[in-house]
Amino acid sequence: MSPGSVLKTAPGAYLSGFGNEFATEAVPGALPEGQNSPQRAPFGLYAEQLSGSAFTAPRRENRRSWLYRLRPSANHPAFQPLAQGLLRSGPFDEVPASPNRLRWSPQPPPAQPTDFVDGLVTYAGNGDAASGAGISIHLYAANRSMVDRVFFDADGELLIVPQAGRLRLVTELGVLDVAPGEIAVVPRGVRFRAELPEGQAAGYVCENHGAFFRLPDLGPIGANGLANPRDFLTPVAAFEDVDRPTEVVQKFLGRLWSARYSYSPLDVVAWHGNLVPYKYDLARFNTINTVSFDHPDPSIFTVLTSPSEVPGTANCDFVIFPPRWMVAEHTFRPPWFHRNVMSEFMGLVHGVYDAKAGGFAPGGGSLHNCMSGHGPDRTSYEQAIQADLKPHKIKDTLAFMFESRWVIRPTRFAMETPALQQDYDACWAGFQKAKLP
């Protein structure tokens, strides 16, 4: 929390559900009853609609919230360009796209005081914000809270995956406390401040320029399973009444812009709607897997999906590989060898990924683009084909994947950083040729 600010919060901490119409007020009586924009809002608050979709979008796709705030959002000076450091957006054409398998070691923590915004580094992406399609993949590393500084992204919604250190996201609509093993999603345009309760934090961000993340259809799985709606948590209303200079940074068409407000814009006293920030504990994921034979397709591990115009072919799927029982009979249990029309960026929150015995460390990443062969390394393969196939639980692990229908293009930084493992291809060296009779 910024020095001297007092956050006033509604009773309780979170509202349960995914895609719900929520209503919450930090001060009793602040939320108008029966209409959105009365002639005079309670207490002289300003009624403001935040639209995340076109007015005429189908109801099932329509996202908007009504905010009741101390000052209108329009009350601010002009924004000025701000140095963007290593933050990038599409089109990702700094360097030629590479068909090679790529893997990165974790980056060292920052040596200088660095907050969440300054600590964002773009590794790869596709599409671009102007087209309303694609994703940008960033890593963050920070060692100080944002103080008298607020950020919002006009280019897309942010799916944040903490890897080390908790984040406290103080948003316009309330507070999200997010720890490693959880995720948070902040909608396009929602302003927030990232605080570091433990003094340091690192993790991953998927900036989604396309359709909203939503729960995947379950098909024959039925009405329950995977990520259940009740386990998603949206914050209750919270606001601060601060008349002190505050820097507001926005990302707009790939560039950062800054304006100096005379107050904190985190001043929404009450709100209702369905365009909301939310968090989810990945330990609540109801993992589906085989109880007979073979390794099912990894789509069974999808937490959230951003669809494209092609049915079943995602702009981005967010997939996890959590602790789970492996019981398949007469089966090669790790993920099999694969060439995929989709492109895959993987990260590791903690533990060891079951298809890589070494080299893939928490805080690192890997990229396997369209039709690049990948799969278990030789050590993992040899262990798996000789394993005693009794029931086995994979414990203390959490890997994830951002999968996209479009080629994921690395940035110049990602291709030139010393963290890029030049020997990654060697993990597939030494496989013996099969011997035919």
Swiss-Prot record:
GO terms for molecular function: homogentisate 1,2-dioxygenase activity; iron ion binding. Keywords: Dioxygenase, Iron, Metal-binding, Oxidoreductase, Phenylalanine catabolism, Tyrosine catabolism. GO terms for biological process: L-phenylalanine catabolic process; tyrosine catabolic process. It comes from the Bacteria. Pfam families: HgmA_C (PF04209), HgmA_N (PF20510). The active site is at H295 (proton acceptor). One of its GO terms (cellular component) is cytoplasm. The keyword Oxidoreductase applies. Pathway: Amino-acid degradation; L-phenylalanine degradation; acetoacetate and fumarate from L-phenylalanine: step 4/6. Belongs to the homogentisate dioxygenase family. HAMAP family: Homogentis_dioxygen (MF_00334). This is Homogentisate 1,2-dioxygenase. It comes from Myxococcus xanthus (strain DK1622). The lineage of its organism: Bacteria, Pseudomonadati, Myxococcota, Myxococcia, Myxococcales.
